[in-house]
Protein backbone atom coordinates (compact mmCIF):
# COMPACT_ATOMS: atom_id res chain seq x y z
CA UNK A 1 0.00 0.00 0.00
CA UNK A 2 2.90 2.36 0.74
CA UNK A 3 4.24 1.83 -2.78
CA UNK A 4 0.83 2.50 -4.32
CA UNK A 5 0.37 5.60 -2.17
CA UNK A 6 3.78 6.91 -3.16
CA UNK A 7 3.07 6.23 -6.85
CA UNK A 8 -0.21 8.15 -6.62
CA UNK A 9 1.58 11.00 -4.86
CA UNK A 10 4.27 11.22 -7.55
CA UNK A 11 1.66 11.20 -10.33
CA UNK A 12 -0.29 13.96 -8.54
CA UNK A 13 2.84 16.09 -8.19
CA UNK A 14 3.75 15.63 -11.86
CA UNK A 15 0.26 16.67 -13.00
CA UNK A 16 0.30 19.66 -10.64
CA UNK A 17 3.65 20.83 -12.00
CA UNK A 18 2.42 20.41 -15.59
CA UNK A 19 -0.71 22.52 -14.97
CA UNK A 20 0.47 24.97 -12.30
CA UNK A 21 1.64 27.56 -14.84
CA UNK A 22 -1.99 28.05 -15.89
CA UNK A 23 -2.72 29.75 -12.56
CA UNK A 24 -0.46 32.57 -13.74
CA UNK A 25 -2.86 33.22 -16.63
CA UNK A 26 -5.80 34.08 -14.34
CA UNK A 27 -4.88 37.74 -13.62
CA UNK A 28 -3.65 38.45 -17.16
CA UNK A 29 -7.05 39.43 -18.69
CA UNK A 30 -7.70 41.78 -15.76
CA UNK A 31 -4.29 43.45 -16.10
CA UNK A 32 -3.87 43.70 -19.87
CA UNK A 33 -7.28 43.46 -21.54
CA UNK A 34 -8.19 47.18 -21.47
CA UNK A 35 -4.82 48.27 -22.81
CA UNK A 36 -4.87 45.73 -25.64
CA UNK A 37 -8.52 46.48 -26.44
CA UNK A 38 -7.72 50.18 -26.83
CA UNK A 39 -4.92 49.41 -29.28
CA UNK A 40 -7.12 47.01 -31.25
CA UNK A 41 -9.95 49.55 -31.43
CA UNK A 42 -7.58 52.05 -33.02
CA UNK A 43 -6.90 49.67 -35.91
CA UNK A 44 -9.25 49.76 -38.87
CA UNK A 45 -10.77 46.41 -39.83
CA UNK A 46 -10.42 45.50 -43.51
CA UNK A 47 -13.44 43.79 -45.14
CA UNK A 48 -12.65 40.21 -46.16
CA UNK A 49 -14.46 37.66 -48.28
CA UNK A 50 -15.27 34.58 -46.16
CA UNK A 51 -16.37 31.03 -46.87
CA UNK A 52 -18.30 29.46 -44.00
CA UNK A 53 -17.70 25.70 -43.76
CA UNK A 54 -20.29 23.51 -42.02
CA UNK A 55 -19.99 19.72 -41.95
CA UNK A 56 -23.25 18.13 -40.84
CA UNK A 57 -24.40 14.56 -40.31
CA UNK A 58 -28.13 14.16 -39.67
CA UNK A 59 -28.45 17.68 -38.28
CA UNK A 60 -31.85 18.55 -39.76
CA UNK A 61 -33.12 19.73 -36.36
CA UNK A 62 -30.49 22.47 -35.95
CA UNK A 63 -28.86 23.36 -39.28
CA UNK A 64 -31.41 26.04 -40.18
CA UNK A 65 -30.83 27.82 -36.86
CA UNK A 66 -27.10 28.14 -37.55
CA UNK A 67 -27.67 29.40 -41.09
CA UNK A 68 -30.27 31.84 -39.75
CA UNK A 69 -27.78 33.21 -37.23
CA UNK A 70 -25.24 33.62 -40.04
CA UNK A 71 -27.81 35.53 -42.10
CA UNK A 72 -28.46 37.77 -39.09
CA UNK A 73 -24.83 38.89 -38.81
CA UNK A 74 -24.01 42.58 -38.81
CA UNK A 75 -21.16 41.79 -41.22
CA UNK A 76 -21.67 42.54 -44.94
CA UNK A 77 -23.68 39.57 -46.27
CA UNK A 78 -22.19 39.95 -49.75
CA UNK A 79 -18.84 38.91 -48.25
CA UNK A 80 -20.23 35.84 -46.49
CA UNK A 81 -20.72 32.58 -48.40
CA UNK A 82 -22.23 29.56 -46.61
CA UNK A 83 -21.29 26.02 -47.64
CA UNK A 84 -22.64 22.83 -46.08
CA UNK A 85 -21.25 19.32 -46.51
CA UNK A 86 -24.02 16.81 -45.73
CA UNK A 87 -21.89 13.89 -44.59
CA UNK A 88 -23.45 10.41 -44.83
CA UNK A 89 -26.87 11.88 -43.98
CA UNK A 90 -29.99 9.74 -43.83
CA UNK A 91 -32.31 12.65 -43.07
CA UNK A 92 -33.18 15.87 -44.91
CA UNK A 93 -30.23 17.95 -43.67
CA UNK A 94 -29.21 18.82 -47.23
CA UNK A 95 -32.72 19.94 -48.27
CA UNK A 96 -33.16 22.10 -45.18
CA UNK A 97 -29.74 23.70 -45.64
CA UNK A 98 -30.50 24.49 -49.29
CA UNK A 99 -33.86 26.02 -48.42
CA UNK A 100 -32.13 28.16 -45.79
CA UNK A 101 -29.84 29.57 -48.47
CA UNK A 102 -26.64 27.54 -48.19
CA UNK A 103 -24.71 25.93 -51.03
CA UNK A 104 -24.80 22.22 -50.26
CA UNK A 105 -22.56 19.31 -51.21
CA UNK A 106 -23.16 15.70 -50.22
CA UNK A 107 -20.74 12.95 -49.30
CA UNK A 108 -21.30 9.22 -48.82
CA UNK A 109 -18.27 7.32 -47.55
CA UNK A 110 -18.49 4.75 -44.76
CA UNK A 111 -14.77 4.00 -44.78
CA UNK A 112 -13.24 7.45 -44.33
CA UNK A 113 -15.38 8.61 -41.44
CA UNK A 114 -14.97 11.78 -39.44
CA UNK A 115 -15.02 15.56 -39.56
CA UNK A 116 -11.50 15.77 -40.99
CA UNK A 117 -12.48 13.80 -44.10
CA UNK A 118 -15.69 15.80 -44.46
CA UNK A 119 -13.77 19.10 -44.35
CA UNK A 120 -11.28 17.75 -46.87
CA UNK A 121 -14.11 16.86 -49.26
CA UNK A 122 -15.81 20.24 -48.83
CA UNK A 123 -12.60 22.20 -49.42
CA UNK A 124 -11.81 20.06 -52.47
CA UNK A 125 -15.21 21.00 -53.94
CA UNK A 126 -14.57 24.68 -53.27
CA UNK A 127 -11.13 24.45 -54.86
CA UNK A 128 -12.77 23.20 -58.07
CA UNK A 129 -15.90 25.37 -58.06
CA UNK A 130 -14.40 28.62 -56.71
CA UNK A 131 -10.84 28.76 -58.11
CA UNK A 132 -10.42 32.39 -57.06
CA UNK A 133 -10.77 31.24 -53.46
CA UNK A 134 -11.70 33.30 -50.42
CA UNK A 135 -9.73 35.47 -48.02
CA UNK A 136 -10.64 33.25 -45.09
CA UNK A 137 -12.49 30.08 -44.15
CA UNK A 138 -14.59 29.82 -40.97
CA UNK A 139 -15.48 26.39 -39.56
CA UNK A 140 -18.63 25.68 -37.53
CA UNK A 141 -20.47 22.66 -36.21
CA UNK A 142 -24.11 22.43 -37.25
CA UNK A 143 -25.53 22.93 -33.74
CA UNK A 144 -23.83 26.30 -33.20
CA UNK A 145 -25.58 29.64 -32.82
CA UNK A 146 -23.69 32.91 -33.32
CA UNK A 147 -23.90 36.27 -31.66
CA UNK A 148 -24.92 38.85 -34.33
CA UNK A 149 -21.50 40.51 -34.12
CA UNK A 150 -19.53 37.26 -34.35
CA UNK A 151 -18.14 37.58 -37.90
CA UNK A 152 -17.35 41.28 -37.44
CA UNK A 153 -15.39 40.47 -34.26
CA UNK A 154 -13.48 37.67 -35.99
CA UNK A 155 -12.73 39.99 -38.91
CA UNK A 156 -11.28 42.65 -36.59
CA UNK A 157 -8.75 40.16 -35.25
CA UNK A 158 -8.09 38.66 -38.69
CA UNK A 159 -7.40 42.19 -40.00
CA UNK A 160 -4.51 42.49 -37.54
CA UNK A 161 -2.55 40.07 -39.71
CA UNK A 162 -3.20 36.71 -38.07
CA UNK A 163 -3.65 33.66 -40.29
CA UNK A 164 -5.66 31.68 -37.72
CA UNK A 165 -8.24 33.02 -35.26
CA UNK A 166 -10.31 31.15 -32.69
CA UNK A 167 -13.39 32.42 -30.87
CA UNK A 168 -15.19 32.47 -27.52
CA UNK A 169 -17.19 29.24 -27.14
CA UNK A 170 -20.12 29.29 -24.75
CA UNK A 171 -23.10 27.09 -23.87
CA UNK A 172 -26.76 27.18 -24.94
CA UNK A 173 -27.84 24.78 -22.19
CA UNK A 174 -25.70 25.41 -19.10
CA UNK A 175 -28.45 24.51 -16.63
CA UNK A 176 -29.66 21.23 -18.15
CA UNK A 177 -27.52 18.93 -15.99
CA UNK A 178 -24.15 18.63 -14.32
CA UNK A 179 -22.45 17.47 -17.53
CA UNK A 180 -23.58 20.44 -19.59
CA UNK A 181 -22.68 22.78 -16.70
CA UNK A 182 -19.24 21.21 -16.42
CA UNK A 183 -18.57 21.60 -20.14
CA UNK A 184 -19.75 25.21 -20.03
CA UNK A 185 -17.36 26.02 -17.19
CA UNK A 186 -14.56 24.32 -19.09
CA UNK A 187 -15.29 26.51 -22.14
CA UNK A 188 -15.25 29.60 -19.91
CA UNK A 189 -11.86 28.59 -18.54
CA UNK A 190 -10.51 27.74 -21.99
CA UNK A 191 -11.69 30.97 -23.62
CA UNK A 192 -11.22 33.52 -20.86
CA UNK A 193 -8.28 32.20 -18.88
CA UNK A 194 -6.27 30.25 -21.46
CA UNK A 195 -6.80 31.56 -24.99
CA UNK A 196 -7.48 35.17 -24.01
CA UNK A 197 -4.52 35.27 -21.62
CA UNK A 198 -2.18 33.67 -24.14
CA UNK A 199 -3.31 36.10 -26.83
CA UNK A 200 -2.71 39.09 -24.55
CA UNK A 201 0.78 37.79 -23.78
CA UNK A 202 1.59 37.38 -27.47
CA UNK A 203 1.82 33.58 -27.45
CA UNK A 204 -0.28 31.14 -29.46
CA UNK A 205 -3.76 29.94 -28.59
CA UNK A 206 -5.26 26.66 -29.80
CA UNK A 207 -8.18 25.76 -32.04
CA UNK A 208 -10.91 23.74 -30.32
CA UNK A 209 -13.33 21.92 -32.58
CA UNK A 210 -15.55 24.70 -33.87
CA UNK A 211 -15.62 28.46 -34.32
CA UNK A 212 -12.26 29.10 -35.92
CA UNK A 213 -10.96 30.93 -38.97
CA UNK A 214 -7.96 30.25 -41.19
CA UNK A 215 -6.59 32.22 -44.11
CA UNK A 216 -6.16 31.36 -47.77
CA UNK A 217 -2.40 31.21 -47.14
CA UNK A 218 -2.90 28.36 -44.65
CA UNK A 219 -5.09 26.45 -47.11
CA UNK A 220 -2.58 26.92 -49.95
CA UNK A 221 0.18 25.59 -47.72
CA UNK A 222 -1.61 22.54 -46.33
CA UNK A 223 -3.95 21.67 -49.19
CA UNK A 224 -7.57 20.67 -48.54
CA UNK A 225 -7.46 19.73 -44.84
CA UNK A 226 -5.05 16.79 -44.37
CA UNK A 227 -5.87 16.50 -40.65
CA UNK A 228 -7.74 13.28 -39.93
CA UNK A 229 -7.05 12.34 -36.32
CA UNK A 230 -9.95 12.05 -33.89
CA UNK A 231 -8.67 15.34 -32.42
CA UNK A 232 -8.04 17.00 -35.79
CA UNK A 233 -8.35 20.45 -34.18
CA UNK A 234 -5.32 19.78 -31.96
CA UNK A 235 -3.46 18.23 -34.90
CA UNK A 236 -4.13 21.38 -36.94
CA UNK A 237 -3.07 23.70 -34.09
CA UNK A 238 0.20 21.85 -33.49
CA UNK A 239 0.99 21.70 -37.21
CA UNK A 240 0.50 25.44 -37.69
CA UNK A 241 2.41 26.41 -34.54
CA UNK A 242 5.33 24.29 -35.75
CA UNK A 243 5.17 26.24 -39.02
CA UNK A 244 5.70 29.42 -37.02
CA UNK A 245 2.13 30.71 -37.01
CA UNK A 246 0.22 31.97 -34.00
CA UNK A 247 -3.41 31.16 -33.32
CA UNK A 248 -5.08 34.41 -32.24
CA UNK A 249 -8.16 34.84 -30.05
CA UNK A 250 -11.11 37.12 -30.82
CA UNK A 251 -12.50 37.89 -27.33
CA UNK A 252 -15.84 39.32 -28.50
CA UNK A 253 -16.75 36.63 -31.04
CA UNK A 254 -19.34 34.69 -29.03
CA UNK A 255 -20.46 31.27 -30.23
CA UNK A 256 -23.06 29.12 -28.46
CA UNK A 257 -23.42 25.36 -28.73
CA UNK A 258 -25.56 22.63 -27.22
CA UNK A 259 -23.72 20.34 -24.84
CA UNK A 260 -24.35 16.66 -24.19
CA UNK A 261 -27.34 15.47 -22.19
CA UNK A 262 -27.04 12.62 -19.69
CA UNK A 263 -29.55 10.56 -21.66
CA UNK A 264 -27.69 11.02 -24.96
CA UNK A 265 -24.95 8.64 -26.09
CA UNK A 266 -21.69 10.28 -27.11
CA UNK A 267 -21.58 10.47 -30.90
CA UNK A 268 -18.52 9.72 -32.99
Segments from the language model and where they lie:
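Acidic helix N-cap motif at the loop->helix transition within catalytic regions
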Residues: 64, 91-98, 106, 149
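Residue-level detector of conserved catalytic or cofactor/ligand-binding positions
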Residues: 257-268
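A conserved acidic beta->alpha catalytic loop
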Residues: 86-94, 109-111, 145
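Short, acidic, metal-binding catalytic loop of nucleotide-sugar glycosyltransferases
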Residues: 68-79
Amino acid sequence: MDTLRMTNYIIAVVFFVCYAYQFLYIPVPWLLAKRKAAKAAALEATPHNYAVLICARNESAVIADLIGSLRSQTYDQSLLHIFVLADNCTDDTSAIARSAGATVYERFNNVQVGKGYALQTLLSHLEQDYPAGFDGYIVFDADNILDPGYIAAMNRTFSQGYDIVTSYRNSKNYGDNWISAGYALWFLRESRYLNHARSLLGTSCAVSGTGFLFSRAVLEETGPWPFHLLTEDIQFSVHEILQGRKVAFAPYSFLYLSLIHISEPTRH
